Amino acid sequence: MKSLILVAAGGAIGASLRYLLGAGVYRLTGGPTGFPVAIMMANVLGSIAMGFFVVWAAHRGLTHLSPFVMTGVLGGFTTFSAFSLETVTLFERGEIWQAGLYVALSVGLSVFGLMAGLWVARGVYL
């Protein structure tokens, strides 16, 4: 139960940070840019933070903070950081084919899933 509360609190923080990043980019650019700059920035920054935290926490004996930081804060900030970590872990284990398959399936099926959700919802509501 404690881990669930930590994940939820971290998720609230991460989602709030992503919102603030988006608002900041919107303000700097004067409005929508036509390219998802804020989301890309969140994904890249979250992936950097995930990579740093994994090593830092292991060296400092702070892996007990992983639910709060990795699943919560970084998961709320971006789900892409976990995807990046899993991909690199597969590469580091020498599982190159599995890493490639994971990337292709994750991206392809996620995009297909979104399209399927749109198709179903449009059929129901339009």
UniProtKB/Swiss-Prot annotation:
It is found in: Cell inner membrane. GO terms for molecular function: fluoride channel activity; metal ion binding. Its main location: membrane. The keyword Transmembrane applies. The chain crosses the membrane at residues 5-25, 37-57, 65-85, 101-121. InterPro entries: FluC. One of its GO terms (cellular component) is plasma membrane. GO terms for biological process: cellular detoxification of fluoride. It catalyses: fluoride(in) = fluoride(out). It holds the Pfam family CRCB. It is a multi-pass membrane protein. NCBIfam families: PRK14209.1. PANTHER family: FLUORIDE EXPORT PROTEIN 1-RELATED. Belongs to the fluoride channel Fluc/FEX (TC 1.A.43) family. Fluoride-specific ion channel. Important for reducing fluoride concentration in the cell, thus reducing its toxicity. This is Fluoride-specific ion channel FluC.
